Design a protein with these regions (language model features):
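Short, structured active-site "lid" loops
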Residues: 68
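A common structural junction motif
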Residues: 36-42, 87-90, 97
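Generic hydrophobic alpha-helical segments
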Residues: 22, 84-87, 93
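Short S/T/G/P-rich N-terminal loop/turn motif that feeds into the first structured element of a domain
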Residues: 1-64, 72-82, 105-109
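C-terminal partner/receptor-binding element of secreted or periplasmic proteins
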Residues: 96-102
Length: 109
């Protein structure tokens, strides 16, 4: 199990979505609600925060939504990725996404 050497560090899992132009407001809302629900369904998720892009820099490349999940360890993150609820979410979101960007990092206090 990979755990940061500093107990105060947190593993951040960042997921950004770019929706297809055919995705409706209802499709997008369904994705938002379903992603939020993963926090209650998957115990390894310590925190889940999300929002929509408000940057004025115009470098978003069409990505509109960003979700940040916190885990205590890489093992917890891996359990989340393999969890049946996460896999079901992937099937829900896949048809309405044009692209997805994911990055994980150990945050420093």
């Amino acid at each position: 199990m990979m755990v940061s050497a500093n107990a105060a560090d947190k593993l951040q899992h960042v997921v950004c979505f770019k929706f297809k132009t055919t995705a409706t407001a209802q499709d997008i809302k369904q994705v938002e609600v379903a992603f939020e629900a993963l926090k209650q369904k998957i115990p390894q998720v310590v925190t889940l925060e999300w929002g929509t892009n408000v940057s004025k820099e115009k470098r978003d490349k069409g990505f509109t939504h960003c979700f940040v999940l916190t885990f205590k360890s890489e093992q917890d993150r891996d359990s989340y990725i393999e969890h049946p609820e996460h896999k079901a979410f992937g099937k829900l979101v896949g048809p309405v996404l044009d692209d997805v960007f994911v990055i994980d990092f150990w945050s420093k206090p």
